[in-house]
A protein has these predicted regions:
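Extended alpha-helical targeting/anchoring segments
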Residues: 1-183
Length: 183
C-alpha cells in the first residue's frame, strides 16, 4: 500500500491512518507476508519464522508506504544461498498463486524485468546476509544511452485500475524528478 503525503499535518496523519486501516491494502500485504513466510519456512528452523511487524506505515518525502517484516533462523544443514534462491521470484513482485501469476506476467509484459524485481545485497563470511528487492530504482544502459525506471502496483480482485495507475505514478515520481523528466 502506498499513499501520497500531504503538506497539511492533519491531512497527512489522516492519510497514514487510512492507509494503515484500508482493507484492500491490508489484504494485499497479508498475501505478501504469507508468501514470504511460506518461502522462508522451506529452510527455516522449526518455529523460527516470525512476522516482526505487520502493517507498519513508513513515511518518506512524498509518500507513505505500508511495510511488514518477516524473519527466520536458518535450519541447520541449509545454506543461506539456497534459502535466498528459493525465495525468488519474490511474492511481493508476483502475487499469488505464484506460479500462475508468473505465467500471466510472462504473457502480458512486453519485456523482461531485468534487475527490476531482482535483488541486491551481500553475504557475510559468517553466513548472515541482507538483500533488498530492487524496486523504484533508476537504471542506465550505456550502450543504448537509455535511462529507465519501473514502478508497479498490485492487481487484485478489489483493485481499481485508475487507483493502481495513480499509485504507479506516485511511486515513480521521485525517479522521474531525479532524471529531470516533466512527464
Amino acid at each position: 500500500g502506498t499513499a501520497r503525503r500531504h503538506s497539511d499535518p492533519e491531512a497527512d496523519r489522516a492519510v497514514r491512518v487510512a492507509l494503515a486501516n484500508d482493507p484492500k491494502e491490508q489484504s494485499e500485504n497479508v498475501m505478501i507476508v504469507d508468501l514470504v513466510r511460506n518461502d522462508l519456512s522451506r529452510h527455516a528452523a522449526k518455529g523460527s519464522v516470525h512476522v516482526e511487524e505487520l502493517f507498519g506505515v513508513y513515511s518518506f518525502r512524498n509518500l507513505h508506504q505500508l511495510i511488514s517484516t518477516v524473519s527466520a533462523e536458518l535450519r541447520e544443514g541449509h545454506s543461506s544461498i539456497a534459502a535466498l534462491r528459493d525465495c525468488f521470484p519474490m511474492g511481493s513482485m508476483t502475487g499469488a498463486p505464484k506460479i500462475r501469476a508468473m505465467e500471466l506476467i510472462e504473457a502480458c509484459e512486453n519485456r523482461k524485468r531485468g534487475l527490476y524485481s531482482g535483488a541486491i545485497g551481500y553475504f557475510a563470511p559468517e553466513g548472515d546476509f541482507d538483500f533488498n528487492v530492487v524496486i523504484r530504482s533508476i537504471q542506465y544502459n550505456a550502450v543504448n544511452r537509455l535511462v529507465s525506471y519501473t514502478a508497479g502496483s498490485a492487481i487484485t480482485a478489489r483493485a481499481e485500475a485508475d487507483r493502481e495507475y495513480d499509485e504507479c505514478l506516485l511511486k515513480a515520481e521521485s525517479m522521474r524528478l531525479a532524471v529531470g523528466s516533466r512527464q
